[in-house]
Amino acid sequence: MAAGDQAADNPEEWGNQLSVLGAEYQALMEDFLSRMVPNDAADSVMEDIRNSFQAGAESLMRNPTLLWETQAKLMQDQMALWQQAMAAASGGAFEPLVTPSRGDRRFKDEAWTSDPGYNAIMQQYLLFSNTVETLVDKLDDLSPGEKRNLSFYARQMVNAMSPTNFVSTNPEVMRKTLETRGQNLVDGLSRLREDLANSAEGLNVTMTDRSAFEVGENIAVSQGAVVMENELIQLIQYAPTTEKVFKTPLLIVPPWINKFYVLDLRPENSLVKWLVDQGHTVFLISWRNPGPEQRDLTWADYMQLGPIAALDGIEQATGEKSANFLSYCIGGTLTASTMAYLTSTRRGRKAKSVTYMATLQDFRDPGEIGVFLSEPVLQGIEAKLEQDGYLDGRVMAYSFNLLRENDLFWSFYVNNYLKGEDPAAFDLLYWNTDGTNLPAGTHGWYLRHLYQENQLVEPGGVELDGVKIDLRKVSTPSYFIATKEDHIAKWNSSYYGALLPKGPVTFVLGGSGHIAGVVNPPHKNKYGYWTNDELPDNHEEWLAGAEAHEGSWWPHWQEWMVKGGYVDADKMVDAREPGGGELPLLEPAPGRFVKTSIPEVLGEAEDDEAAE
């Protein structure tokens, strides 16, 4: 191979590097073994993996012809590949039997196509990968859940085996190793040890240069102030940028699985700033990063201390008794619960409208996240929650990254640990790694009763503070925005949620995924969206009758707000400054809750400083 043609010109230096490499590897193994402690959650995942592959094996035993045909096809392809490799080694031209899919960035290095040896390795791997995928897909006697889980675990196995993940079969890494005389591997092992030490369970790879960003300094910089605080939230009121503002204020309810500033990363892509610039008086809930002390917080507590407390704060700050809601992800699920609760307690008028961004209310099809919610895995999570009082946000991040493992795990594994290079500075990836913990009382209930048992869609299926709620009784006008490629909140599931309220509903489908499709500023003119005034029972029928539009959905939403009368556009008032009402200025936005990291919550940062 091309990389192997280079000579090692200094054997003594190579010997020294191998000694250093050996010492780093030994230290890494000691670190790894020290983390090998009994873990109910990890054990439950292993049980689920065993169950999934056993189900697949039993399916193949019931259909031996499928196994035989698949093996025969793979052997035939391998023979053709061997003949091709022999011809290429003799200098002949060759046409590849298989090539990477369009979105596969692992094999972008030129050597994968120009070097016959590397090309043969790549094709051999792709043939195996495609065979496994096809085989699992043809196991039609498995239940949908069994097939989903087996497909996920098989994909994890196959992608872990990619030749790009190993030194000797990755041309980029081989070149780097020869150029640096192995220093890249020494540096990579050092980075791996550091990341392992900073991970709760599994491995949280470093995705970005974290020193390049500081919350409140160069991200989350929209001007405003914290005007209210309780044990769970800080309520931020943002400073106006227009002389007049809409009479009805706007409350943003973000998710608490991660931090709110994905909606306020930079001024040019900030949804918060855009809303303020349109004339909204924007309030936003900043959730506390919880620890063991918050273990008993319930879904009802999140509702009372979150949206309902925020409504009271907004009335004190502005004098307005109602507000518009703009919610996101699990924040939207909580908001839907809140709408039903307010309706049942005859306070539904406190919300003039409600918007759900990438939100699940009907959990019948959770997508691949369902892999983490099989009964063995869920029982393991519940045991861990009971033991610790919280779910470490780094564990959640690791799980979510495995839903896009090649982009969000293995690419950084190769860059950081095999090439020994620093990741680039990227604000979105900084946010992605700035996680939050999840309290036991809330998260365990959410996973069991909503994700697994889908009780929120049942009339009276959920009881909050003694009140049985029913989403079908909510008459508040609703705007649903789902995104076509969302792997967290699948758009078909979001659509089924839109069929629940009895009030007027507008459903819009955006392009792209869970983040980019939601945070899609108009000036970029990207992704597009679809609209359809009808709401048939089937999501595919809705899409077939939908009209495509270019650009961002944000202006469409703004037009819906104005034309619907939800902002009282004919009753503009003077701009409201934070602190201008009955609520005092507590501290500048974005506040301290959002700046609190997981290590700080758990006392790890202090321990590290003491060790130094």
Give the ranges of each region predicted by the language model.
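Amphipathic, low-complexity, repeat-rich surface-exposed segments
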Residues: 1-234, 245-246, 283, 349, ...
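Alpha/beta-hydrolase-fold enzymes
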Residues: 141-176, 316, 320, 334, ...
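Short beta-strand element of the alpha/beta-hydrolase
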Residues: 245-256
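Alpha/beta-hydrolase active-site loop
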Residues: 294-318, 334
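Catalytic histidine neighborhood in serine/cysteine hydrolases
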Residues: 447, 497, 501-536
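Short beta-strand/loop motif that positions the catalytic acidic residue
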Residues: 480-482, 486
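Conserved alpha/beta-hydrolase "acid-adjacent" motif
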Residues: 487-493
